[in-house]
Amino acid sequence: SDLINAFCHRDYARMGSVRFLVDDDGLTIANPGGFIEGVSEDNLLTAQPRSRNPQLALILKAAGYVERTGRGVDTIYAGSIAAGGSFPDYSQSSAEEVILFLRRVVPDEAFVTMIGDEERRRGAPLPVWSLIVLSLLREHRRLTMVQLCDFSHLEHRRIVSAVENLVEAGLVEGDR
């Protein structure tokens, strides 16, 4: 999904290539053109989906390269977290280019197994919001709702809903 997003959302009015770099630190993907108007690093997951190149997005969907248009970033986050990795890093992006960095990590096998078991039990993938909460709790062990919102850059209502679902599933314990 990250490779497809780079080609689908690049600014074709700008010169330059989509660049991929795999090194000891991880995978970096850079494409010409900053984020689409109204989208920033802080609202990538919650901004209204829009494509810079809607015809290309439709072609990629028709060809089977994407399941749903407008959900590429969600898929990138979910895939990275569910594989035991860290959050995708867009912090080096600018008005001239979007840069995605996926850090190389040794997957936490217990975490990956827990996610896989829960997804099999549900018969569906965990929502990206739940994966974000689980990842943050794996890293920090104990967080308040305010801290979860701060670390995730997500709205309180999304975090509350995700935590409630995770508590109900028995994956996390909540304090009152």
Model feature map: region roles:
Residues 1-176:
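C-terminal regulatory or interaction extensions
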